[in-house]
Each structure stands twice: as structure tokens, then as C-alpha cells.
Amino acid sequence: RGMKGKKKNVIKVIIVLLVIGGIFYFAQPWIVYYTGPPRWTYERLCQSVQSGSYWNSARGRALDVDGHLDELKTETVFLNKKIQKLENGLYLLQCDGISEWQTWLVLFNRYPISDAKRDFLLDTMKLKGSDDNVNVEMKSSSYPDERFFGAYLYVVLPSPMQIDDTITLEIDGKEIDIEVETVPDVSENYLRKQG
């Protein structure tokens, strides 16, 4: 009898854990929808924009917020990671690299499951800069089934374009003003002088 009772208890515990896990699995997208994504997702999204060895040219060193040199464990160096909530479920992450032409914008949605299939591939983004009224249309692939991020879209700002105030992003026919700051050119020499 004792063994049977233990088995029943184990089965009950397993069922309870499965129920709790299931509730969290389905509730989590709604929680993120209202609270915004957890901080670790920014780092992961920023890291996944790396596309070559030039990301590593600062050898894992970057200036932190207070201007001190910071040894980073990750290979990818970003001076800045800023998140901007455009509307519920739609976020813009700015990843700034080690020079002004390494600014990436990551537009991603975190809608609950019913709306998570949105694919930015079908959208045309118009990016309007403050200098020379630059108007760049871009399309890019996205990953609509990624559970933690929903669909997301990477945009690298064109290198000649120095943006120092706002750009206008048009998506789904709706214009969204985005504040973008240029990053100072932080080359390896500059880091060496400071160090």
C-alpha cells in the first residue's frame, strides 16, 4: 500500500507541475505584452546582429555608461543598448557598435500567440533621416515563430547617414518617430589611449 500511495503522490506532483508549466507557457506572452521583454533578450538580440570580425575589433572592451573601460565577456561589443516601446507589444531596440556606422535598429513585436505570426518581410519600412531628408526603403527577413521575441527585423543604418535626432519609421502605413543618437567613434586606438 505504501508504494502505491507514493506512486500516486508522485503522479499528482507531476500533474500539478505540468499544469503550472502549461499555464505559464500560455500566460508568458501576455505578461511580456504588458511588461516589456526581459533584459537578457536585448543582449541576445544585439548579439545576433553581428556579421563579421569587425564587431570584435575592440577586443571585448567598451566604455560603460560612466566612461570607464569595461571588460566584456561577450565577443560582440556594444556601447549602448536602448529599448523603446512604440506601442503595446511593439518595441525598438537600438544596438550601437564601436563606431558610428555600426548602429543597428532591431524592431520586434511581442504580441500574444494569436498575433505572433506577423512577418515583417511583407512590410516596407521607410526610414527618413534628418540629414538631407534621406528616405531609405528596406525589406528584411524576420523570424515570426521565435517565441521570446515574436517577429523581428534588423535594420543597419546606412554608413554615410549621420542621424542625430529622430528618424521616421513607417510600418503598416503608420508613421512612428524614433529618437536615435549617433555614437562617438570609439576605435581601438581611442580605447588604448583611455586605458
What are these regions (language model features)?
Residues 83-122:
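Short, surface-exposed binding/anchoring microloops in extracellular/periplasmic proteins
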Residues 2-23:
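N-terminal Sec-pathway targeting helices
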Residues 175-195:
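Short, low-complexity, Pro/Ser/Thr/Gly-rich segments in the mature regions of secreted, periplasmic
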Residues 13, 29-41, 157-160, 167, ...:
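Extended, compositionally biased low-complexity polar/Lys-Gly-rich tracts
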Residues 25-99:
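N-terminal export/targeting and maturation segments
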Residues 112-123, 128-181:
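Short, solvent-exposed, Trp/other aromatic-anchored flexible loops in extracytoplasmic proteins
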